[in-house]
Curated annotation (Swiss-Prot):
Residues 1-20 are cytoplasmic. The lineage of its organism: Eukaryota, Metazoa, Chordata, Craniata, Vertebrata. The keyword Lyase does not apply. It catalyses: a globoside Gb3Cer (d18:1(4E)) + UDP-N-acetyl-alpha-D-galactosamine = a globoside Gb4Cer (d18:1(4E)) + UDP + H(+). Keywords: Glycoprotein, Glycosyltransferase, Golgi apparatus, Lipid metabolism, Magnesium, Membrane, Signal-anchor, Transferase, Transmembrane, Transmembrane helix. This is UDP-GalNAc:beta-1,3-N-acetylgalactosaminyltransferase 1. It is a single-pass type II membrane protein. Gene3D superfamilies: 3.90.550.50. The gene is B3GALNT1.
């Protein structure tokens, strides 16, 4: 009996080892085939931003505005305009912002306007969704939309739309911020920060990313091809969670966008334009003003930040309500 058992166990162990070996061999074969199927490009170590530049504005986008703000911003002089990228189906996210950090239109007498940036829903869109979006715009008048397809890979087109809209329809805004629907903005802190600046020209700030490497791996959301971006390192840029700029930079960046082919990552794209314009990013002295990665913030931390990324609509409402309470913070 014991002898038979010892005979069976090694055979089972051998079978299991064989199975693992075959699995690893299959995985290795897949990786080799995947690597061989890739076009082989040499990563360019030394960056030359003129690689992206065309002398004629051949990349000027001519998409049409299908929805615009109700109020005529060209006749206003807002201190700050906040432009929020949003997907057509993100109704709850937009509403959460409208009743929290985007609700108040004046801070200490300084006008702050908030608008949402959208593309068109896919061709097979729910007609009820399209209708409700029209109704939403009639009700709030804060949606800006063009007729390009609203997809993740078209985020750069949405950013170009933002720069065009400010240039053509809201040129008097002293400062402009671009952000996303999953970002918590402490609007009061943002206004205070801008009021305390020593200069109001050639100013661009946010969460700085310096010497950030281009990713060539499997994860499609952060992958960029060699054809699209051949350099090893991205330019200095500010994360798309929220970057802020002075009025004078908006038309200059928008004009440059007509000469630079859009790439997948809108924040990197803006960084390329800034480098071509020889504009340096302003790095905040306080490193806790912008949070790129999701962290567990308490109310006292939220009172110190300008922008924190990774919040759901429900969390934005909850944290905003908590932040407004008379809680004593010992800094």
């Amino acid at each position: 009996m014991a002898s038979a058992l010892w005979t069976v166990l090694p055979s089972r162990m051998s079978l299991r080892s064989l199975q693992w070996s075959l699995l690893l061999l299959s995985l290795l074969s897949f990786l080799v085939m995947w690597y061989l199927s890739l076009p082989h490009y040499n990563v360019i170590e030394r960056v030359n931003w003129m690689y992206f530049y065309e002398y004629e504005p051949i990349y000027r986008q001519d998409f049409h505005f299908t929805l615009r703000e109700h109020s005529n911003c060209s006749h206003q002089n807002p201190f700050l305009v906040i432009l929020v990228t949003s997907h057509p189906s993100d109704v709850k996210a937009r509403q959460a912002i409208r009743v929290t950090w985007g609700e108040k239109k004046s801070w200490w007498g300084y006008e702050v306007l908030t608008f949402f940036l959208l593309g068109q829903e896919a061709e097979k869109e729910d007609k009820m969704l399209a209708l409700s979006l029209e109704d939403e715009h009639l009700l709030y008048g804060d949606i800006i939309r063009q007729d390009f397809l609203d997809t993740y890979n078209n985020l750069t087109l949405k950013t170009i739309m933002a720069f065009r809209w400010v240039t053509e329809f809201c040129p008097n805004a002293k400062y402009v911020m671009k952000t996303d629907t999953d970002v918590f903005i402490n609007t009061g802190n943002l206004v205070k920060y801008l009021l305390n600046l020593n200069h109001s020209e050639k100013f661009f700030t946010g969460y700085p990313l310096i010497d950030n490497y281009s990713y060539r791996g499997f994860y499609q959301k952060t992958h960029i091809s060699y054809q699209e971006y051949p350099f090893k390192v991205f330019p200095p840029y500010c994360s798309g969670l929220g970057y802020i700029m002075s009025r004078d930079l908006v038309p200059r960046i928008y004009e440059m966008m007509g000469h630079v082919k859009p790439i997948k990552f809108e924040d990197v794209y803006v960084g390329i334009c800034l480098n071509l314009l020889k504009v340096n990013i302003h790095i905040p002295e306080d490193t806790n003003l912008f949070f790129l990665y999701r962290i567990h913030l308490d109310v006292c931390q939220l009172r110190r930040v300008i922008a924190a990324h990774g919040f759901s609509s429900k969390e934005i409402i909850t944290f905003w309500q908590v932040m407004l309470r008379n809680t004593t913070c010992h800094y």
